[in-house]
Amino acid sequence: MTVQKLVATAVLVALVSLILNNAAAFTPNWVYQTLEDGRKRSVGLWKSCWLVDRGKGGTSPGTRTGQVDTHDCEVLGWGSESAGFQESRGTVKLQFDMMRACNLVATAALAVGQITFILGLTGLPLMSPESQCWEEAMAAAFQLASFVLVIGLVTFYRIGPYTNLSWSCYLNIGACLLATLAAAMLIWNILHRREDCMAPRVIVISRSLTARFRRGLDNDYVESPC
């Protein structure tokens, strides 16, 4: 079974997006916060950790200043207000809850796209590589992932003076761009195929038609393969 290189490349790009999206979700480095007393911590979607230079438990042996102390972390969940500290707790809670929801939806959508690709390779009637529905289903899944990630990331366009975006956030931006690229590649391939099939039929008229009408005259014509 031959799979088009463009489709395979788009699925590979979406797989990288899925990996980056999960890496951004489960690392406590979404934002860095600095308190008035000088303490610093890194906050992720599901966990927050104090930095070892001024953490509550002091510097751990063998660690460098500015590193995350994995022994002094707090699990965060839906509606956690501790992510705010000196910032507006309600605003920060809404930002992180929105991002958690969008991250989960994007993960599910990207996973569905990968499963759809695998099912197509098995030769199912509705999901075969020759079926246009196969590419459309993957494109819709990847586009949904891109859309919800944009919604979640937009909520962080405004942050407080004590908060700075960290590398996990930028990692998720990369995942969003890759999901968009994967969807765009599939959509371009679908539209390109449709343009080929929507071309007008090519009809070759026999020269004998210019002669007088005779019974039994056959018309020669050639139609496009689509």
UniProtKB/Swiss-Prot annotation:
One of its GO terms (cellular component) is adherens junction. InterPro entries: TMEM204. Residues 27-103, 158-170 are extracellular. Residues 1-5, 125-136, 192-226 are cytoplasmic. The keyword Hydrolase does not apply. Keywords: Cell junction, Cell membrane, Glycoprotein, Membrane, Transmembrane, Transmembrane helix. It comes from the Eukaryota. It is a multi-pass membrane protein. Glycans are attached at N164. The chain crosses the membrane at residues 6-26, 104-124, 137-157, 171-191. It is found in: Cell junction, Adherens junction; Cell membrane. One of its GO terms (biological process) is lymph vessel development. Can influence paracellular permeability. Appears to be involved in cell-cell interactions through adherens. This is Transmembrane protein 204. The gene is Tmem204.
